[in-house]
Amino acid sequence: MAITDWPAGERPREKLLERGAGALSDAELLAIFLRTGRQGLSAVDLARELLEAFGGLRPLLEADLDRFCDHLGLGPAKFTQLQAVLEMARRHLHAGLERGEALTSPEQVARYLTARLRHQSREIFACLFLDNRHRVVRYEELFQGTIDAASVYPREVVQRALAHNAAAVILAHNHPSGVAEPSVADQALTRRLQEALGLVDIRVLDHFVVGDGRPVSFAERGLM
């Protein structure tokens, strides 16, 4: 049955307009993006097929061009559209942290860092540099590869913080495995950076580990 033959309240577009995007399933959201299905499949049916083939929404969104286009119903045009949508979402979150408002919500920071780091295929260590009113001065990705006390140089983090005249820092890195549980090495690294930044009176407010689901906050865990 074509989507146009569905009850109005069950059609993805009408459902979104009536109840908001949060009321839609992953398949329904993807169907709106796809716009059309293929012979014998509605856009929602195609969306369900693709989600099953990729293993969920996140792997689909993070697929490279070759893997994305390997599926019937997808091609370079859809890939570029999707990348544009994802980049707009990241920039929207970034702009929200650049409006000069003080950071008061860990959820706000977690959403931003998730958008920045979750899609990365390798470990990245980043810093949010803040002024004395906890407003974002700069976001920087400083190190890539295996993130541990041997590969992240406290002196360089201190230099970047001083260059931005930061009064505080929020640390972040991702676990490409998807498991956001802080490791012993993560905790040791955090202590080293706290000590180094403390020598120049710069506070480390938190350290987020980004994986699948909600990022883990060291501050909320009582690890700092």
UniProtKB/Swiss-Prot annotation:
Zn(2+) binds at H173, H175, D186. Residues 102-224 form the MPN domain. Coiled coil: none annotated. Keywords: Hydrolase, Metal-binding, Metalloprotease, Protease, Zinc. One of its GO terms (biological process) is proteolysis. InterPro entries: MPN, RadC_JAB, RuvA_2-like, UPF0758, UPF0758_CS, UPF0758_N. A motif (JAMM motif) lies at residues 173-186. SUPFAM superfamilies: JAB1/MPN domain, RuvA domain 2-like. GO terms for molecular function: metal ion binding; metallopeptidase activity. It holds the Pfam family RadC. CDD domains: MPN_DUF2466. Belongs to the UPF0758 family. This is UPF0758 protein Mlg_2664. It comes from Alkalilimnicola ehrlichii (strain ATCC BAA-1101 / DSM 17681 / MLHE-1).
